[in-house]
Amino acid sequence: MKEKDFINTIKTVLNSPLIGDDCAYLASLGIVVTQDSLVEDVHFSTSFITPFQLGWKSAMVNISDICASGAEPKYLTVALSLPKTIEADFVEEFYKGMKAACGKVEIAGGDITGSDKIFISVTAIGKCGDRRISSRKNARAGHKIIISGNHGSSGAGFRLLKEGKQTPESLIHAHLMPEAQVEFSKKIASSIKENYAMMDTSDGLADALSQIAEASGVSMEIDFSKIPYDKEIEIFSDFEDLILFGGEDYGLVAAVPEEITKDFTIIGEVREGSGITILKQDKKFHLSNAEVSEKLFNHFN
């Protein structure tokens, strides 16, 4: 059974309109809420990430989800499960990393328990205020597709770390200490007057595009040459796959009306249809939503 199958089962059982985006939009309270977990030997290895970096990343992956909703990140709570062998300095450095990542976002409490491996679960709360909140269901034919951040860097950095390498430093840094696209999110959500779709690219750019396409009942047409990436990833022969499927870059991709696209990087347009069409060197390649799903990381393989 695949991760998506589990999610669909949960949706069927709960039958809640709040489920479907990375954040739950609680309109009556004026907030969005999200939760994400990091598990040792699934999402990270202590052989190549420091406690400070782990704390930083744990905060940023959740702040990124809030940014994808368009809300302002405000609070985090942290549930931390640790083996008995962990020393106090690990916890100190972990929380220093979280605090550094959070900036004005306040860590408002949490829980700590024992476990066989390190398990981190973070809940993040965002304030909506006068911002318009996104939904992956809101893409419409004619919308322009805009993007923030380089893509492929984190996946390349992960490969290098697995090979015991520490350079290029920009790729290592991208994997260990990602940065949420706070200003990009604020600029869109504070100025847009119409519904729009936005997701972060934590599971890969192709995944985000496919998820929006499927939820909105549209197709995404992308000009591959417009996607921003760090040239350092060209050390890998399949760097183009890393750009689309690498994941953990925590950029944002949005489908928005053309009139607000000034000063943003446009990589394509929403069309009628389904799946993703990629324009590359005068050729077109089409990926169905199912084909994209098959190429992505699956927790339950």
Residue ranges: model-predicted function:
Residues 38, 72-159, 269:
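Glycine-rich anion-binding loops of enzyme active sites
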Residues 51-75, 96-101, 187, 191, ...:
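Small-aliphatic-rich amphipathic alpha-helix that forms the alpha element of a beta-alpha
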Residues 1-50, 69, 74, 78-79, ...:
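Extreme N-terminal cap/leader segments of soluble proteins
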Residues 156-173:
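Short, compositionally biased
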